[in-house]
């Protein structure tokens, strides 16, 4: 099984000069390689059609960059940093994979990008949704799982405890998507439309192999 994975971009400093680098967090690599998945990084918009042809699914990883509000018709909050625009790369990947009906999984920033790509909007800043420590056992709040959703198949439960590492969230849901999870304070934390799935938390940090295994079995086989 082959899964394309969005590599993220960040700045780093060398000799007082800012440089860009692309990276993948090891959490994703550890979880998915254990399940026999070959990960193919998407590093640019060039030759993306070949990656789509070769791969069985797309994973949109979490990342450090906020989505420019222009993409969902709002003015930027002056208190929020908008440094690197990754949206065109992600949008092209989502457009190409969805066009050929291959499954897509969006995590954290990935769920937000999916929502905006398909016509939704975001809250630019929300309080109390960011844990300071990243461990497999750290959770922050409960989410309610909607019955008959993919997530309910995964967890066989009406609620679960999840971690939280975000300060933006879905506001207006994209047309034709359904909500699959809602946080205890009322924010959308899971969405789905057919074989397009998004979650706001980080199952890879929680080492939730069952989540990824269910996605693979449900949509990639």
Q: Residue spans of the language-model regions?
A:
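N-terminal beta1-alpha1 cap of cysteine-dependent amidohydrolase-like domains
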Residues: 1-105, 117, 127-155, 171-177, ...
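Active-site glycine-centered loops adjacent to acidic/histidine catalytic or metal-binding residues
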Residues: 108, 166, 202
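Active-site loop->helix "elbow" adjoining a glycine-rich segment at hydrolase catalytic centers
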Residues: 109-111, 118
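Post-Walker A helix-loop "phosphate-sensing" segment adjacent to the P-loop in P-loop NTPases
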Residues: 119-123
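Short catalytic/ligand-gating loop segments at beta-alpha or beta-beta junctions
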Residues: 159-167, 191
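Short, surface-exposed beta-strand/loop micro-motifs that present aromatic residues
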Residues: 187-193
